[in-house]
Amino acid sequence: MEKAVKQEIMEKYARHEGDTGSPEVQIALLTTRINHLNEHLKIHKKDHHSRRGLLMMVGKRRGLLNYLIKQDIERYRAIIKALNLRK
């Protein structure tokens, strides 16, 4: 992922200026990487090493979403809606 794209995502989902580690930012960055890797795997169906990486990223995102549910359900609902994810 390019630095400019990453910076744009961080600015969009940051809770305050300079925020790079909040769950919302991490989830948004993972979602972007997951979507990019999904497109790659549509073309390269036998790339099982990348598929494993994709599954690990999906699991990590799921963990962050579960954390967000426990901490603040409204923030969870907002990020789900903003990123157009399933519940």
Swiss-Prot record:
Cross-referenced InterPro entries: Ribosomal_uS15, Ribosomal_uS15_bac-type, uS15_NS1_RNA-bd_sf
SMART domains: Ribosomal_S15
Keyword entries, A-Z: Ribonucleoprotein, Ribosomal protein, RNA-binding, rRNA-binding
Hydrolase keyword on record: no
Keyword Ribonucleoprotein belongs to the record: yes
PROSITE patterns referenced in this protein's UniProt entry, alphabetically: RIBOSOMAL_S15
Annotated signal sequence range: none
Gene3D superfamilies reported in the protein's UniProt record: 6.10.250.3130, S15/NS1, RNA-binding
Functional summary from the UniProt entry: One of the primary rRNA binding proteins, it binds directly to 16S rRNA where it helps nucleate assembly of the platform of the 30S subunit by binding and bridging several RNA helices of the 16S rRNA.
Family: Belongs to the universal ribosomal protein uS15 family.
Record text on subunit structure and interactions: Part of the 30S ribosomal subunit. Forms a bridge to the 50S subunit in the 70S ribosome, contacting the 23S rRNA.
HAMAP family the record matches: Ribosomal_uS15_B
Protein name in UniProt: Small ribosomal subunit protein uS15
Gene that encodes it: rpsO
